[in-house]
């Protein structure tokens, strides 16, 4: 007889984050560029978060940053990722709060929430695949 663990008993075993840049074929300009406040956007930084549970369930999430913040977003994600290890991947709202508190000194907006967003999408992906 095979024993199957309940989803609530499964735990996050590992988390991986990666970042890459998507170059734009044509730089994008807007009013901020026309007024001289910013340069044209030439690339988009994409943050990926991959989560796997002890039972082998996987979720993949992403977030992005335009013009600035990509390296900071990645650094923040790397710093808070270990807070997910050993946690119940189904308790997504609680994990959002835990990650927000893990990086509270950075703030609760901008690159902080963009970094958390990649984990959030990965957790929802994992939950959907498990359903």
Regions of interest found by a model, annotated:
Residues 14, 52-131:
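Metal- or metallocofactor-binding catalytic centers and their adjacent structured scaffolds
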Residues 2-65:
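Structured beta-strand/loop patches that form or line metal/cofactor-binding pockets in enzymes
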Residues 1-6, 82-86:
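Intrinsically disordered, low-complexity boundary segments flanking structured domains
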């Amino acid at each position: 007889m095979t024993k199957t663990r309940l989803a609530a008993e499964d735990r996050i075993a590992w988390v991986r984050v990666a970042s890459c840049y998507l170059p734009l074929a044509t730089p994008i300009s807007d009013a901020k560029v026309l007024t001289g406040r910013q340069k044209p956007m030439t690339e988009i930084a994409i943050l990926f978060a991959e989560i796997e549970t002890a039972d082998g369930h996987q979720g993949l999430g992403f977030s992005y940053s335009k013009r600035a913040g990509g390296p900071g977003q990645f650094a923040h994600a790397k710093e808070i990722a270990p807070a997910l290890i050993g946690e119940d991947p189904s308790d997504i709202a609680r994990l959002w709060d835990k990650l927000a508190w893990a990086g509270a000194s950075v703030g609760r907006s901008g690159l902080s929430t963009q970094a958390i967003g990649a984990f959030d999408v990965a957790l929802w992906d994992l939950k959907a695949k498990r359903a």
